[in-house]
């Protein structure tokens, strides 16, 4: 356990629990008897024990992962959670999801800007954190990106990346050569302004030259 980013004992327990339970499951379960779905369900009793002892632990297993893909002028948003026994509920009006919100059963097809909020729920209420996707919309949103760099396709999915690389919304060019990509608008369209967003952190720097053709 590397503790350079931990400022208290609670930070340490947050990092190691329930990961220690997963490590024990892998080490102690006989070969051929490892069952992910049984394990995550059995964690409920273990987490109850941690709470009763006042031990802070991570609830990341209840958080939602997303994938937003530009497709035929729209954006397909896929949501998933590590826990198979919870329901993902969502809203598209900017309101916080609750137990009465629609249940996610299939990818959401987005054709305009707005805010999607989603969270996981079980029989007792909300679990984990709310995922908020602020869907921006412009002439390029939902359009095809032609580029050898697979991550460039994120440029037109309407979701802006955060400072956390784990949001999977980063587009990166680790090359000394110029980065080049084409956004296919599908037809001749007037363009009044082009904006390129950059996260100015220690491993990136703004472009020196930008050519649009």
Tell me what each language-model feature is:
Residues 203-212:
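A short, hydrophobic C-terminal helix/tail in secreted or cell-surface proteins
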Residues 131-188, 193, 197-204:
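Disordered, acidic Ser/Thr/Pro-rich linker "stalks" and the adjacent N-terminal cap
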Residues 81-87, 188-191:
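Short proline/glycine-enriched turn/loop motifs at strand-loop junctions of beta-rich domains
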Residues 106-113:
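Solvent-exposed segments in extracellular or luminal domains encompassing
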Residues 1-75:
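Flexible, acidic glycine-rich loops studded with aromatic residues
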Residues 96-104:
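Short beta-strand segments within Ig-like beta-sandwich modules, predominantly Fibronectin type-III
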């Amino acid at each position: 356990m590397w503790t350079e980013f931990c400022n208290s004992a609670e930070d340490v327990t947050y990092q190691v629990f329930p990961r220690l339970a997963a490590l024990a499951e892998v080490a102690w379960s006989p070969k051929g008897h490892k069952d992910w779905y049984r394990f995550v369900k059995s964690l409920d009793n273990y987490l109850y024990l941690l709470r009763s002892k006042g031990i802070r632990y991570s609830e990341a297993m209840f958080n939602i992962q997303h994938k937003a893909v530009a497709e035929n002028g729209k954006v397909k948003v896929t949501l998933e959670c590590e826990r198979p026994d919870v329901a993902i509920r969502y809203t598209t009006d900017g309101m916080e999801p609750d137990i009465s919100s629609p249940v996610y059963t299939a990818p959401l097809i987005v054709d305009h800007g707005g805010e999607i909020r989603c969270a996981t729920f079980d029989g007792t209420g909300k679990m984990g954190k709310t995922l908020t996707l602020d869907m921006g919309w412009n002439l390029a949103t939902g359009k095809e990106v032609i580029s050898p760099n697979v991550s460039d396709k994120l440029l037109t999915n309407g979701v802006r990346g955060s400072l956390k690389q784990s949001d999977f919304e980063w587009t990166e060019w680790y090359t000394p050569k110029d980065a080049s990509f084409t956004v296919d608008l599908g037809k001749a369209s007037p363009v009044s302004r082009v904006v390129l967003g950059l996260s100015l952190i220690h491993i990136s720097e703004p472009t020196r030259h930008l050519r649009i053709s």
